[in-house]
């Protein structure tokens, strides 16, 4: 044996300490992200406690600045009082599509997966891509075969609500890459039914 070789090998106790430290750092990161998301969700719940139900089945109050869907098991759609007419109908269809697709359940699950892998940038990239495609799918359902004028109104609504800050814990209408969403909507054509 070479002199000093025994002294250069890591001690079993020190390796254990490194793994414990890494596990503690990982757990702390997960806890911080989940507590932050839970706090945002609770803040939103408090904000809409005075919301009243509207004839179209949504909820509204003065504190609601942008359309969003909140809740996992019994999701509710919240709309600003100022949103009326054809843009409101399109936005409502967008939010109802989120509920029909199960997005209020799948988005928190994707977020949880990203939190568990918080140290990995690819996990966050995948989460952002999921959010983007989710919004595009709901946009497509909202405009369907709408004429150009209604499509322009809908795009204007996206731009209007994109300036409102992000709301963690909710499916907010203005989320996503705005320029990409608007460009996609302006080019979108509803696919023709497949003939067999």
Predicted segments with their positions:
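Membrane-embedded and juxtamembrane structural elements of multi-pass membrane proteins
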Residues: 1-196
